[in-house]
């Protein structure tokens, strides 16, 4: 029998482990039905967020339905090498001319929405595919995205705990980039909230 995304997430919570499930188990041979995909909001569309976005877009079990960042669209983000983020985005969009006349490092929620929609449009061969919402405030996102399964927290470090706790209290599973928090008391609150809400959580350590 097929396993829906919610059955899978519920089982992960009950067992307390993270399991990698083959595609054919989730949705039949080589295909995952849209209703069985894990719907994800990507919170934080800066340098590190875009560095890790491509892997999520390419995952057939995941559908990014929303992005969030207080910044709309700019090209003044810090990066480790010249044009590194722009070139990464070009690679996973299959578009070598993406923003060719724009200098600097791109970031912001509208850039995130543009990239997510462009990736899925290319995947579906639909020129105008639009399915990703963009929010300036993560609290508004959590209120409006009723069918959301999980969030990935890619904000600056000082917001990790705040966003994660708010998401867990809404019953959303949380994937968080390190660190859990900047302060010990906040880290403890994150762990306590995870135990109380019994949602699935995972911390991405350095290099993972």
Residue ranges and their predicted role:
Residues 1-170, 188-200:
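N-terminal glycine-/serine-/threonine-rich beta1-alpha1-beta2 phosphate-ribose binding loop
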Residues 173-175, 180-208:
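A contiguous active-site-proximal alpha/beta segment in oxidoreductase catalytic domains
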């Amino acid at each position: 029998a097929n396993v829906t995304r919610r059955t899978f997430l519920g089982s992960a919570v009950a067992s307390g482990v993270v399991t990698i499930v083959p595609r054919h188990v989730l949705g039949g041979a080589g295909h995952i039905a849209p209703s069985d995909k894990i719907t994800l909001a990507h919170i934080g569309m800066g340098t590190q967020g875009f560095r890790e976005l491509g892997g999520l877009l390419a995952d057939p079990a995941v559908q990014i339905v929303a992005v969030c960042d207080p910044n709309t669209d700019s090209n003044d983000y810090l990066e480790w090498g010249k044009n590194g983020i722009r070139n990464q985005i070009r690679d996973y969009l299959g578009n070598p001319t993406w923003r060719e006349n724009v200098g600097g490092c791109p970031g912001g929620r509208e850039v995130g929405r543009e990239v997510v929609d462009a990736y899925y449009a290319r995947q579906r061969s639909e020129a105008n595919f639009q399915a990703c919402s963009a929010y300036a405030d993560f609290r508004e996102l959590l209120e409006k995205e009723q069918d959301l399964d999980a969030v990935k927290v890619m904000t600056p470090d000082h917001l990790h705990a705040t966003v994660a706790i708010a998401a867990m209290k809404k019953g959303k599973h949380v994937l968080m980039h390190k660190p859990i928090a900047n302060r010990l008391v906040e880290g403890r609150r994150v762990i306590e909230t995870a135990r109380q809400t019994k949602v699935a959580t995972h911390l991405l350590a350095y290099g993972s």
